[in-house]
Amino acid sequence: MTLTSALTRHLKCPELFRNLANEPHPSVAGQRQRFSVFNPSTGELLAEVPDMGAADAHAAIERADAAQEPWSGLTARARSDILWKWHRFILEHSDDLAAILTAEMGKPLGEAKSEVQHAAAYLQWYAEEANRIYGETISAPSTDRRMLVIKQPIGVVGAITPWNFPASMVARKISPALAAGCTVVLKPAEQTPLVAGAMFALAKLAGFPDGVLNLVYASEGDAIGRELCTNPKVRKISFTGSTEVGRLLMRQCSDQIKRISFELGGNAPFIVFDDADIDAAVDGAIQAKFRNAGQTCVSANRIYVQSGVYAEFAEKFTERVRTLKVGDGFDPNVAIGPLINQEALKKIELHISDAVQKGARVRSGGRRTGSSGTFFEPTVVTDVSKTMRLAEEETFGPLAPLLRFDDADHVVREANDTIYGLAAYFYASNLKRVWRVAEALEYGMVGINTGRMSSEAAPFGGVKQSGIGREGSRHGLEDYLDMKYLCVGGL
């Protein structure tokens, strides 16, 4: 991999990351193509990355399989100690990791630093959880038997991470696998492979044995994903991305009856009831909608506001949105970075055009901005109805549609009227309403009077077509463990 000065000038320790982890393995090395990674804010070339294929993925799986038995044979304390070292190195080099993240993904540097801290928190959590993998004893039906349950690592894990949180998603998927005693083959998103490589470089310093962590770069993920899903030595796939790709991977895994953890698309409702603290709701909506320029799977995609407070909320919310500065993530005053590519720009423009044609009104923003890069103004659209595309499809950009409602039961039905079920938010003060709405919303995660709810201590995941399984918390570890029942007779 070759890094350019457009990236290294932002780094305190460029030599540490100059040769990022896992250049092609000698068994499959030779003449190969490379793909380019660009800064979406400036268009500058950041790096030339080896473009790997199915043969590389197969070789990585073989290395992971060879390392599986010795890695799982270590004590939980030994695995925990290495995770702790990785955690420490991540924190020591957090500024450089954040700079890499901002350069290749575009998000504001402050958000990038928070993401790196979040990644480190997952490593810390699972370094601790590695020592808490417990079995159980069962009361036997006869005196000559003893019955118990033990938990063992499932084996080699294939992980596929997205571009929108390229550091925290690596840690969230890999750390529980490593804690459980599994080896890993990781395929990072082609738009943002550099921070994953930097994290793996630090993992090498932490002392992970050869073959435990394996990185496969590729400009096109189809061949890599197919090899991970169909190779019988891979026992589990963990994927974060679109529901469409999730369906494809699930089909590819079906012949192997492979265990899967999928965190897929969302269409998150954000509901403001008339008894809500409006100023707090505005703050929460800004967080839930515009973090990472709206490019998050839990981004508020539909903002429902009860009629009695609609005008007040719309005015205060729009006023706040107008203060959000758009630009290069390295500018300390910037709140909204670029969209990831031109396709993302076209989608947000399509959603706005469709809404306006059907009677919506643009209150703020609505245009591309900047002389270069993929920037779009944070946009507020009012008088939105459910028939508009921006209310039915995940926009994945800084576009906030405001929908009016009168009846609480009706808005819950509207919020649930989607194939997705990842995250939902609502603001209210009436305790009876809080409990009823929280239980009625068909989502895996519900934020009540808050616009942010992700934590390493909480189970992250969705229902319906938003995913399978949970990441984070003690529950996230269970997805990497097999339960084995032992029955001892003749006693």
Curated annotation (Swiss-Prot):
The gene is gabD. The active site is at E263, C297. Belongs to the aldehyde dehydrogenase family. Pathway: Amino-acid degradation; 4-aminobutanoate degradation. Pfam families: Aldedh (PF00171). One of its GO terms (molecular function) is succinate-semialdehyde dehydrogenase (NAD+) activity. The keyword Electron transport does not apply. Catalyzes the NADP(+) dependent oxidation of succinate semialdehyde to succinate. Gene3D superfamilies: Aldehyde Dehydrogenase, Chain A, domain 1 (3.40.605.10), Aldehyde Dehydrogenase, Chain A, domain 2 (3.40.309.10). Its EC number is 1.2.1.79. It comes from the Bacteria. This is Probable succinate-semialdehyde dehydrogenase [NADP(+)]. NADP(+) binds at W163, N164, K187, P188, A189, E190, G241, S242, L264, E394. It catalyses: succinate semialdehyde + NADP(+) + H2O = succinate + NADPH + 2 H(+). GO terms for biological process: gamma-aminobutyric acid catabolic process. Keywords: NADP, Oxidoreductase, Plasmid. The lineage of its organism: Bacteria, Pseudomonadati, Pseudomonadota, Alphaproteobacteria, Hyphomicrobiales. It is an enzyme of class 1 (oxidoreductase).
